[in-house]
Amino acid sequence: MATPAFEHDHSDMGKRKITIDGEERPYWEQLFWAGMAVCSYLPSTVIPTGPNDEGLPIGVQIIGRQYGDLETIGLAKLLEAEGYAFTPPPGYE
């Protein structure tokens, strides 16, 4: 029997909304930013930057120039050294 790993929205994808800064936006708008790197074949590295004020995880996508894979990874390492890292939620330490 298939079971979900976590609770998620099964509604029509075109009708889904996500709240950003108190404003409801179409869910698919967020994929635009990831698509910029994917569609142009640019290297990208995604890193966690820690939780927000509500404890939800936040991350950033570092997009580099063509063939700049090691540059995006290097910047991610620098940010991690400055304290931008994954913080396990309570109970998952």
Protein language model features and the residues they cover:
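Serine-dependent amide/ester hydrolase catalytic core
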Residues: 1-35, 39, 90-92
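Structural helix-boundary/capping segments
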Residues: 38-93
